[in-house]
Amino acid sequence: MRLALLSDLHANLQALDACLSHARSQGADRFAFLGDLVGYGADPVGVLDQVMAMQAQGAWVLQGNHDAMAVMPPTGDVSMGASTGTWTHAQLNEAQRHFLAHLPLTDTVDHVLLVHASADKPEAWRYVDGERAARVCLDAAKADGLARVLAPHVLVGHVHHQTLYYQGAGRGLMPFKPTPGVGIPLPRSRACVVTVGSVGQPRDGDPRAMYALYDMSAGRLTFHRVPYDHAAAAQAIRQAGLPEHFAHRLETGR
């Protein structure tokens, strides 16, 4: 199985289309969406149409915090993120809201745990943003029975950057920053936590979309960066009347 891992799409249809096309060109035959399908971006309907169709064909799909926000926008929150949640809610029909509301927070594929945020209380939307947080995430996956093996691979989104935290000689997890397109051996015997990056809103100074491809048969993980028409995605945000900050973020990757 070659499993394409896509997270934090954020209603960016241009980026999603580019990543799906690239993943298929790399031999991806299964797909997993790790949450935050909507929010920030201008095309939640187009993105959900694609993801819902792919779920019907066997894709794994999880709920992220922005998906939950689109179902039930917060009241009294005047932040830019909350305002896009309210806008997104208004764009969706009842079937799309029902779809988002009933997505699971976690799922498993063989020895792999899929989760949007940390496996430590997934509903709290905690970030895996360093070695300590990765250790807490991995320990929670083992202790709570979310992973069915002693050396699980925990694959997460939420943080909008790509890092592999792998089990070293001791108990600690070591961070590794990948080179796009270069495969990394990922044996089942070594526990790890992987942040797969963001399809629809990169934040590391590179506007190219991110996803990862896990060849489970070969035990190899490859992180990818994919160019797409981020100018068109940014212009769509402006035309929708959403905050300029989110358009600028797509153009700069920050």
Q: Model-found features: residue ranges?
A:
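N-terminal active-site segment of His-dependent metallophosphoesterases
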Residues: 1-57
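Active-site neighborhood of phospho(di)ester-bond hydrolases with catalytic His/Asp-centered motifs
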Residues: 6-7, 31-35, 40, 60-65, ...
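Anionic-ligand binding region
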Residues: 138-154, 159-183, 189-191
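Acidic, His/Gly-rich catalytic cores of divalent-metal-dependent hydrolytic chemistry
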Residues: 167-254
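Active-site environment of divalent metal-dependent phosphoester hydrolases
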Residues: 10-15, 39-41, 66-71, 120-122, ...
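Beta-strand-turn-beta hairpins that frame and shape the catalytic cleft
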Residues: 1-3, 107-114, 187-193
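Active-site neighborhood of divalent metal-dependent phosphoester bond hydrolases
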Residues: 48-150
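Glycine-rich, phosphate-binding/catalytic loops in enzymes
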Residues: 22-23, 48-51, 79-80, 131-132, ...
